[in-house]
Amino acid sequence: MKSSLPGALFQRVADWLRLLRAGNCAVVSLGAYTGYVAGRGGSLPQGVLVAASAALVAAWGNIVNDYFDLESDAISKPWRPLPSRRISPGSAVSASLPLLAAGLALGFLVSPLCGFTAVLASALLFLYSWRVKALGLPGNVLIAFLAALNVVYGALASPEPWRSLLPSAYAFLIILGREVLKGVEDLEGDAARGVKTVASTLGARAALRVSAVLLLAVVALSPLPLLSGYGALYALFAFGGVDAPIALALLKAGPEPRRAWIATRILKVPLLMGLLAFLVGGLA
């Protein structure tokens, strides 16, 4: 009996980390900190506070998303913590509220502007999970906007927040391009549920073209930061870690769901590498 306790505890912790989507929260934290650095923020404690605030609000949003997706996940993702009942919906909601409170409190601690921006982001996250996600393209646009807002959020704690415009544009275009392509991956299920994505309304090939335009816009933006002081480290991450994977994803993408699935997995790389490009470029 005693020997099973560590295993049970590990499983419990792992389930909560899956529910919170710890990896996603880490990327959100990185995005906010990147915005802070891009805006010439020089205080490590201030940057950590705004990054932690963003991660806590994101963790709350991830729980809310799974709560509203409980019925559909019971069919499509029964292994997730909530549909499998390894974590009860009530426990999840109860745990989410302190996360939200802490995230908002840290935001207001940084500045009133950051605090009110965190409140706005929280409201939009709730609306996304509750209603907008099921609308298809509006949900794609909203989640891309929230990714961009996260970068701006970090920059609002810095002296020159306008400098976050380029990294936030990166985030918006990459996320929106990927979300449109995911519509090809999920075409059959979205069509059956009446979700209005580009793919389900205009067809898979139209969605591929829209996604390609958005992602190629990222490639076109890549040289611009070099004109505003970013140097070789930025170029290394941007051209090698963003542009090259985008090119590979577009080559792999196709109207078949399997090919779209491969491309959307590749597109996880340029978002992370794009943030790192602006982070290391801003610190150099």
From Swiss-Prot:
One of its GO terms (molecular function) is magnesium ion binding. Its EC number is 2.5.1.42. The keyword Mitochondrion does not apply. GO terms for cellular component: plasma membrane. Its main location: membrane. It is a multi-pass membrane protein. Pathway: Membrane lipid metabolism; glycerophospholipid metabolism. Keywords: Cell membrane, Lipid biosynthesis, Lipid metabolism, Magnesium, Membrane, Phospholipid biosynthesis, Phospholipid metabolism, Transferase, Transmembrane, Transmembrane helix. One of its GO terms (biological process) is glycerophospholipid biosynthetic process. InterPro entries: DGGGP_synth, Prenyltransferase_related, UbiA_prenyltransferase, UbiA_sf. It catalyses: sn-3-O-(geranylgeranyl)glycerol 1-phosphate + (2E,6E,10E)-geranylgeranyl diphosphate = 2,3-bis-O-(geranylgeranyl)-sn-glycerol 1-phosphate + diphosphate. Its cofactor is Mg(2+). The chain crosses the membrane at residues 44-64, 99-119, 137-157, 164-184, 210-230, 231-251, 260-280. Belongs to the UbiA prenyltransferase family. DGGGP synthase subfamily. Prenyltransferase that catalyzes the transfer of the geranylgeranyl moiety of geranylgeranyl diphosphate (GGPP) to the C2 hydroxyl of (S)-3-O-geranylgeranylglyceryl phosphate (GGGP). This reaction is the second ether-bond-formation step in the biosynthesis of archaeal membrane lipids. This is Digeranylgeranylglyceryl phosphate synthase.
